[in-house]
Structures are given as structure tokens and as C-alpha cells.
Design a protein with these regions (language model features):
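A glycine-rich, coil/turn loop motif that links secondary-structure elements
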Residues: 33-42, 116
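Alpha-helical transition-metal enzyme core signature, strongest for iron centers
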Residues: 12-19, 42-57, 84, 88-98, ...
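Individual transmembrane alpha-helices with interfacial aromatic-anchor signatures
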Residues: 118-133
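His/Met- and acidic-residue-enriched segments that coordinate or traffic transition-metal cofactors
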Residues: 21, 25
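Short, solvent-exposed secondary-structure junction/capping segments
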Residues: 27-31, 138
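Short, helix-capping/interhelical loops that line the mouth of catalytic, cofactor-
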Residues: 1-7, 51-120, 149-169
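A short gly/proline-enriched turn/hairpin at secondary-structure junctions
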Residues: 31-36, 57-60
Length: 169
């Protein structure tokens, strides 16, 4: 794998930090915002993000069965029961969750073949392509929701580094 396990965990934790930074920019009045009727609202997107990453990591590690809809329904139902603050707390917990889930995973485990959603891959490739890239994609979606709701001051620094842009001099 191109990334070390430590780099993978660090990258996933960085995604959590950026997501929480962006979530801190949400005005509660925009929680029901959705770009089109069939897209997730801001709160629904956050609720999905509160379980997507860790559940996919568990799937890659064989801790949940790929074809078991009960697993996804249980985590989805738990997420649906959360309010905004509880959802953010669940997301914040991912920092430790990722470290714990991947603690005993070896480089050999990451190179092991795995049946992903699109066919055979390695566990490491699945974790990078689906979990890490998925986190980046969905936080970008949240960023776009924020921009659409008038948060014009947000910049690429918010999106990619999870920080506010320096004040203009």
C-alpha cells in the first residue's frame, strides 16, 4: 500500500477534523436545507457521515458482513435518532474509532484481497478509495451546501485544511 497504516489513520482523523470545522459553520436554520427534493438535507448528510466511515472500515476488516442489510439498518436507525449535537459528537468520536479499528491491522492485512462493492480489490485500496475518498467527497458536499446557504466567506482553506482563511491585510 502506498500509505502506511499510520498515515491512513492520520488522514482519516484529518477528515474528521475538517468535517467538524465545516459543521461548526452551519447555522441551525440551514439544517433542513437540501439542494433538490431528492438530495439529503444538511442534517441528513451529517447523520450519514456519522456512521459511513467506521461502518465501511468494519466491513473491510470483516467485522460486519457485506450482504447483511441489518448492519446498515441498525447504524442508520441509530443515526436517525440523533439530534444535531449528538450527530457532531458521534462524528468527533471517529477520531478514536479509526485508531482503534485499525490498531491491530498489519500491512499484510491491508494488502489482502477483499471483495469490495465493485469486485476484487485489497483491503487497503478499499479503505483509501471508499472510506478516505468518500469522506473527502461528502465533506465537499457539505462545503457546497454551506456556500449555497450564503457562507461566502468560506474558502479552500476551510475545505482542505479545516481552518478559516487568514484575514485580509
Amino acid at each position: 500500500m502506498v500509505l502506511t497504516k499510520s498515515e491512513l489513520v492520520s488522514s482519516l482523523q484529518h477528515e474528521v477534523r475538517i468535517l467538524l470545522h465545516l459543521a461548526s459553520k452551519i447555522d441551525r436554520a440551514m439544517l433542513d436545507y437540501r439542494p433538490t427534493p431528492k438530495q439529503r438535507s444538511t442534517l441528513e448528510l451529517l447523520k450519514y457521515l456519522s456512521y459511513m466511515g467506521p461502518t465501511l472500515v468494519k466491513l473491510a476488516l470483516g467485522k460486519v458482513e457485506r450482504g447483511d442489510p441489518g448492519v446498515w439498518m441498525a447504524v442508520r436507525d441509530a443515526a436517525e435518532a440523533r439530534d444535531f449535537d449528538e450527530t457532531l459528537a458521534a462524528i468527533a468520536a471517529h477520531t478514536e474509532t479509526y485508531a482503534t479499528l485499525l490498531a491491530d491491522v498489519s500491512d499484510e492485512d491491508l494488502r489482502a484481497e477483499f471483495e469490495g462493492f465493485s469486485g476484487k480489490t485489497t483491503r487497503g485500496a478499499f479503505l483509501v478509495n471508499l472510506v478516505l475518498c468518500g469522506c473527502a467527497a461528502y465533506r465537499t458536499q457539505l462545503f457546497l451546501y454551506l456556500k449555497a446557504c450564503g457562507r461566502e466567506e468560506l474558502t479552500t482553506a476551510n475545505l482542505w485544511r479545516g481552518v478559516d482563511a487568514p484575514a485580509a491585510v
